[in-house]
A protein has these predicted regions:
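Metal-cofactor-binding active-site regions of metalloenzymes
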Residues: 1-12
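Histidine/acidic residue-rich metal-binding segments in metalloenzymes
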Residues: 12-175
């Protein structure tokens, strides 16, 4: 089980992680919300690290990605969809991992969906850093063109990516 690293996942106050761990939590996360204040985030990660726990991060720049439906592309523009560049994922990953590395917490990047993020994680792992990653089945099976006809059930966070990102993840998932 996972538990919220900050109270009400608001990113303002650190949860009582040791009590949550005693209650059965094996990992901590802030869900789909990033912790914007780096001082609070680092303190929370230090606390999780002191418990030899895992932090699961949702990699995206929250403000860049808030309320969007698609990845920035010609397709999204043609459809008139609000969008975010796929680099928002890499921005979130790099920021979060920098703080995770400072705290020496075990870090899991949830739902990696782009080639650039995958390559960054591969680089960090080659340096012996404490990082793992995952993706979602949606991002392995579908791409941004699947939202045609405004299929709202494909409104995901992170949004569906290009076919080339999807194929890259499929070809390299074993890494």
């Amino acid at each position: 089980p996972t538990a919220a690293i900050t109270k009400k996942v608001e990113g303002k106050e650190i949860s009582e992680l040791s009590f949550l761990q005693d209650a059965g939590a094996v990992a901590f996360t802030n869900g789909l919300k990033s912790i914007e204040n780096p001082k609070i985030f680092l303190r929370a990660l230090n606390y999780a690290s002191s418990l030899d726990s895992l932090f699961i991060g949702h990699c995206e720049d929250y403000y860049f990605s808030e309320g969007v439906s698609a990845t920035s592309s010609a397709f999204a523009t043609k459809m008139g969809l609000s969008s975010t560049p796929k680099e928002a994922e890499l921005m979130g990953l790099e920021r979060d991992f920098l703080l995770a590395d400072l705290s020496e917490v075990n870090y899991h990047a949830a739902q990696i969906t782009t080639k650039k993020s995958f390559l960054k994680i591969k680089e960090l792992k080659s340096l012996g850093k404490k990082i793992t990653a995952g993706t979602s089945i949606h991002h392995l099976l579908f791409d941004e063109t699947d939202i045609k006809n405004y299929r709202t059930f494909f409104k995901l966070r992170p949004p569906l990516r290009s076919n080339s990102d999807k194929l890259y993840l499929l070809q390299n998932i074993k890494d």
